[in-house]
């Protein structure tokens, strides 16, 4: 059973223009140390939500009528948390999170919820959920618990260069299309800010390939209107140390994306 | 924000695309052997590119774009017209490769050593690894890649931080040596225990060997600590001699470049092991103001105790270093005193300043430092 509740505290976004990002409530709220109170503790994805909010704020500062904004919805698939749906909504209000909708569904049909809500990016701490969402054509990424420990205020999105260079194959795998359109929208958002002091940073990382891959990725992204801020070419070097300096919030690849393998 | 108006067709045509077989293959399998052969022919050279080593196994040299290449004109645009104009200029001139900078001959020489090492030890990862570390924006990336291609450099790794400090990345890359035009960044790196030096473009560039890497070091405050220099600066030459004599058998403490000399020594031994001592493509030099008969002894004893061999030790006993360096023609010469660095540069030697120790308080610069 899938149900959606609107958050009346928050102004609803323009359905045609907004970039819908779904995050699981299990990622946003910490339910482990449960003292049974009204409000959950903050979880891994909490700083991410704040960063998304900051981008929206700055976009509206640039233009008060801006409609290309992040539209964040909280999706609850966890049975335990579902039973406490009011706690989720009250926690959201307590922290003043800019969540426009709450979706409740079971583990089995949460992908239906994603598709119904036109979700362009799904973020979760559960690998299985990432796989399943991808298989259903929804761009999704795994939130890394280690990296979340030193969050940045700036929204840092990592794009995998090894995936970008794939030539447009016909038919395009569903994940690829989602990644392309999301990165294009990200590029549009990025263009509204100057070089420095941007609330959003796009980081290109080529994990396996060398400078050719990186160059191709930069060119391809540029042709889509995506200006990259940082570019790191690893050419097979271990990614751990560099990722901990980069501190991306999530990684965009094509379909299944893992920050740490 | 810079608006791009590039025709995608223009951009995408003529690109060499690497053959990628991603783990989540989209089922586009090249079943027939002929098809694969054909594809490979389009990518001649890519299949013969050696795999870069793991950073922790290699001697990693991080160079900034401003010392690897000459970017004075672009720097001027940045200073006079701001970052947006600077990036626009870079993109406009994207297909124009930069000219070689002061670190260029050094990097070429590192690659020559790698070629020899690979011949002798094809499976080993004990090689030089070069990482381009720049706080440039990724907008400049394509021009840098075009330049690397143009000069046939073997650089597969880079780090364009888009304005944030590169220091954290230096550590993540297990950097053994960092070369930059920015004295502040170099000081930060030294403070983090990473060997680093600021490089300057000499007015005339003397020719250096393209078969043998030559690295020259000053002694005090470069290979060794600055303790003796402190004595000299505080109490004069006589006290310095006295102190060195009294402490002849006490090892000097290590300086910021000791580790790099050690790394070079390890690679040298690999050539010796294959009977190539006379033909070794790495040669190291100590060029010090100490005297052979007196203060130099302590330096030699220290090096010996550290198990470090230096190929040539030149004790100048205070004589100017310029002429000696002109004879040696090192690919890089490390000194803690700007006075010596500038003197060397005037004679065409590629000199790098190590901003470490007491000498920094007594800078007698002829020109303003670190651009």
What is each residue range found by the language model?
Chain A
Residues 1-261:
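HAD-like aspartate-dependent phosphatase fold
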